[in-house]
């Protein structure tokens, strides 16, 4: 892979990571409700799910999955249902802003696992990666190293972007003056979770 091809993929990866989706919403809500440490656990979970998708694409299962309507539909509805459930939980969340008490109700391990599931149950992610990676793979060069470079680039970029979303959420938290504002913010993010879930449910297999 040439440096020019890598820069082209880097730009593509940045644009894709910046696009608001379930991962960004999950990171911001976790940062708001559980603080920066909770957000770090969530980001680690998102990258674990993304890494699993990348490995599946690298061994060829991504292409097989993208051609299976049944597998796509099963994962799609599981992901949509999970996001809508998260949205309902977020909508009903209390307006508390005491991060110490919140940390005791949901451990960082739970936040990590939740984030892994958010990414794993997004079939559009693995289908998109299966279509995107081959566009930047040079067949005359060793493919394994190229897949590793693309995968590491994807994860590093997404980590940086998600840290940005978590930081943005912390900035928003500075403007929250009481439980009523926090409750309203939880309803907004809960609605966004449900919206993304509905959009995922409406996705069609290519």
Swiss-Prot record:
Organism superkingdom: Bacteria
Name used for this protein in its record: Homoserine/homoserine lactone efflux protein
Family to which the UniProt record says this protein belongs: Belongs to the Rht family.
One of the record's GO cellular component terms: plasma membrane
KW Methyltransferase (keyword) present: no
Entries under NCBIfam families matching the protein: 2A76, PRK10520.1
A GO MF label: threonine efflux transmembrane transporter activity
Compartment list: Cell membrane
Any GO BP: homoserine transport
Chief place where the protein resides: membrane
Role according to the record: Conducts the efflux of homoserine and homoserine lactone.
One of the Pfam families matching this protein, by short name: LysE
UniProt keyword annotations, A-Z: Cell membrane, Membrane, Transmembrane, Transmembrane helix, Transport
Topological category with respect to the lipid bilayer: Multi-pass membrane protein
Transmembrane segments: 5-25, 45-65, 68-88, 117-137, 148-168, 182-202
UniProt cross-references to PANTHER family, sorted A to Z: ARGININE EXPORTER PROTEIN ARGO (PTHR30086), HOMOSERINE_HOMOSERINE LACTONE EFFLUX PROTEIN (PTHR30086:SF14)
Keyword Hydrolase attached: no
